[in-house]
């Protein structure tokens, strides 16, 4: 594996928008019983649905441990590649590499030198004191392993960052949240301006928009932006919304809406904000919590916990939107309607049973990682 010195922008790289063409999608395979209920059997069915749906539009590689490889291979469609890569859990948005690309700069450039991956530091969303589990040693190797398998050059970075904490428009703008990136459990030695400088140097952006907070109840990640809002095109965002003024989410949504109304992107465009209503609220049931093996190795899953359920947490595939469906028919149907109107040239595919993913802290965007086409 080639390790590149200096920063991605020094070499002419930038992070493309998620709607730009992909060569494939990377997904993990859930198995840990202290996070996924009933030994992850329900989650594995939903991960299989997600992988199968995405594989209609682009190649998919699923990474499973040696103990789970055969099980994953048997459940997944034959055309989905399954490779043996172990991880502590299956959140590939956060433990997978952030891919960056550059335009061809000389005749000597070949394809493999037009894409690279960023190997951010990972600390299980908060380290030993606040993180979701106490051993993340396997997660820390996933980026290196994927880049090695694909023979893609690697940039390493000592800054703690997860892929779900950033969104880019591919034209110079990044959105993140202060709740996550300025949390003392990530990079307490770095100031806001220093973190912003690193984002610019590694993602190739010129402007960083800081939302104060993420989705209410998204305590595992400390408010990742990918549960709160996302770009749908340059100058336009989808924002998690609620009309219920008694819901604590209302204040957060209004706060973000107000911010987007007062700023412009890197190219001076005002933002169009499209509201996407959250489901529920949804809460973990006694039965669901009882199915999680509680030990000292991971955060407990307790009955009555509000689930960080958001329709913004979808995946943009080549020509498709792979969107969560939580079993709340009113808002499930509304989400499909809004997404279909927002992405008129994409097929919107709803994944039934997405509640199984959010029970463990994330959703479809959190379990996927796109690899750009070059």
Curated annotation (Swiss-Prot):
EC number(s) reported in the record: 3.5.3.12
Pathway: Amine and polyamine biosynthesis; putrescine biosynthesis via agmatine pathway; N-carbamoylputrescine from agmatine: step 1/1
GO MF assignments: agmatine deiminase activity; protein-arginine deiminase activity
GO terms classed as biological process: putrescine biosynthetic process from arginine
Broadest EC class assigned to this enzyme: hydrolase
Source organism, top-level taxon: Eukaryota
Matches recorded under NCBIfam families: agmatine_aguA (TIGR03380), PRK13551.1 (NF010070)
Job of this protein: Mediates the hydrolysis of agmatine into N-carbamoylputrescine in the arginine decarboxylase (ADC) pathway of putrescine biosynthesis, a basic polyamine.
Name used for this protein in its record: Agmatine deiminase
């Amino acid at each position: 594996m080639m390790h590149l010195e200096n920063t991605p922008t020094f070499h002419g790289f930038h992070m493309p928008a998620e709607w730009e063409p992909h060569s494939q999608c990377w997904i993990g395979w859930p198995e840990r019983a202290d996070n996924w209920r009933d030994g992850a059997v329900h989650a594995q069915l939903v991960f299989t649905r997600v992988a199968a749906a995405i594989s209609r539009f682009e190649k998919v590689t699923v990474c499973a441990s040696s103990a789970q490889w055969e099980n994953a291979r048997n459940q997944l469609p034959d055309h989905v590649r399954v490779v043996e890569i172990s991880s502590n859990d299956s959140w590939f948005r956060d433990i997978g590499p952030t891919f960056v690309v550059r335009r061809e700069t000389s005749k000597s450039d070949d394809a493999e030198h037009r894409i690279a991956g960023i190997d951010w530091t990972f600390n299980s969303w908060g380290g030993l004191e606040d993180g979701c589990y106490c051993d993340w040693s396997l997660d820390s190797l996933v980026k290196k392993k994927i880049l090695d398998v694909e023979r893609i050059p690697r940039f390493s970075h000592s800054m703690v960052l997860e892929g779900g904490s950033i969104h880019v428009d591919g034209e110079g703008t990044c959105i993140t949240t202060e709740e996550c990136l300025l949390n003392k459990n990530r990079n307490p030695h770095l100031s806001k301006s220093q973190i912003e400088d690193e984002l610019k140097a590694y993602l190739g952006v010129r402007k960083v928009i800081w939302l104060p907070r993420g989705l209410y109840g998204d305590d595992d990640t400390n408010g990742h932006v990918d549960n709160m809002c996302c770009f749908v095109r340059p100058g336009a965002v989808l924002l998690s919304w609620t009309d219920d003024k008694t819901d604590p989410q209302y204040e957060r949504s209004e706060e973000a809406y107000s911010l987007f109304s007062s700023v412009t992107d890197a190219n001076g465009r005002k933002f169009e904000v499209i509201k996407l209503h959250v489901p529920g609220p949804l809460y973990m049931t006694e039965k669901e919590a009882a199915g999680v093996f509680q030990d000292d190795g991971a955060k407990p899953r307790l009955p009555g916990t509000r689930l960080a359920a958001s329709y913004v947490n979808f995946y943009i595939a080549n020509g498709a939107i792979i969107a969560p469906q939580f079993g709340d028919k009113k808002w499930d149907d509304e989400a499909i309607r809004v997404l279909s109107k927002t992405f008129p040239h994409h097929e919107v595919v709803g994944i039934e049973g997405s509640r199984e993913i959010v029970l463990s802290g994330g959703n479809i965007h959190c379990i996927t990682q796109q690899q750009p086409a070059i």
